[in-house]
């Protein structure tokens, strides 16, 4: 298939990547896009951290990240992991490591399935307000320090068959990257590639990469440039997508979707996190909704419903809620609720079942494109359930 054919195809063609194992969860183009999140409890509060991890896993997070800003937090992860497993929860755990974190990362790597580092902070020097430039010699000297500091962690992760996320944040680029490339997607990409090349030199390839920013256009440019740069240099590592600090409510969800869904539609992205200033478990339905809307995963009923207009023959919003309440547990079905027969049958042609206003007070029920029966409006929802039962596709709610 040519690039032009792919552009106009109705299915998304994902960028081909290697598979990276995080515990027993596979990340990469041969596998479904993975949903993950991060607890907001203090890691030193063992009971609260364990409860947060289990709660996220039960909500559908397939990987859970925990912050480890100190050695005490890193050591606590051993107890946390044991307690999580004792509760029968097998979700893979990721440790988040930032400022000058090699010792922390070396400690916590024993207790988790993946370590996340921030290239801009991993070898951190306080910025000099009087600095005017970085010479090539100074740039290279810091690069040598990074290599020396990073190598023991890479070796440990390689030998233990653990994973690493090279997680760049637009807001925390190293001073030398800012001087050399500016506060740009190019600076983000070069920050990541410096660490990618070290891993490659040390024959470690269990890597996932993220390029997060709080503004969707910056994030989009950085991920696209990262993918192109890896392709040029012969690397095929998976991408972890996210818009950092997206906020809360409708806007936070829309902002995250604008960034994540745009890249997924381009075929980029192998695991996602929607970052909201809310309880972490509220991020999970947004992730699955993004994936389902793009046809990348199907984890819920797909409802097709018209927006309502003057032709609508019943209270469409009310009926849609009733249909959803009755059928939302039937994962895998497509159900259409359409207000009239003008557009209804055509727009819902791909649905498994249709509920369409036929005439005032009368509902037509469809199986695919075929009209099966007409029923009084007040019997419509129950008749739809009965039709699904007749087809052997009904299961009782849990």
From Swiss-Prot:
The enzyme's E.C. designation: 1.17.7.1
The entry's keywords: 4Fe-4S, Iron, Iron-sulfur, Isoprene biosynthesis, Metal-binding, Oxidoreductase
Cofactor(s) named in the record: [4Fe-4S] cluster
Keyword Oxidoreductase part of the UniProt annotation: yes
Positions with a binding annotation for [4Fe-4S] cluster: 306, 309, 340, 347
Cofactor, how bound (note): Binds 1 [4Fe-4S] cluster.
GO molecular function: 4 iron, 4 sulfur cluster binding; 4-hydroxy-3-methylbut-2-en-1-yl diphosphate synthase activity (ferredoxin); iron ion binding
Pathway linked to the protein: Isoprenoid biosynthesis; isopentenyl diphosphate biosynthesis via DXP pathway; isopentenyl diphosphate from 1-deoxy-D-xylulose 5-phosphate: step 5/6
Gene3D superfamilies referenced in this protein's UniProt entry, alphabetically: Dihydropteroate synthase-like (3.20.20.20), Sulfite Reductase Hemoprotein, domain 1 (3.30.413.10)
Any single biological process term in GO: isopentenyl diphosphate biosynthetic process, methylerythritol 4-phosphate pathway
Function: Converts 2C-methyl-D-erythritol 2,4-cyclodiphosphate (ME-2,4cPP) into 1-hydroxy-2-methyl-2-(E)-butenyl 4-diphosphate.
PANTHER family membership: 4-HYDROXY-3-METHYLBUT-2-EN-1-YL DIPHOSPHATE SYNTHASE, 4-HYDROXY-3-METHYLBUT-2-EN-1-YL DIPHOSPHATE SYNTHASE (FERREDOXIN), CHLOROPLASTIC
Protein family according to the UniProt entry: Belongs to the IspG family.
UniProt protein name: 4-hydroxy-3-methylbut-2-en-1-yl diphosphate synthase (ferredoxin)
Lineage of origin: Bacteria, Bacillati, Cyanobacteriota, Cyanophyceae, Synechococcales
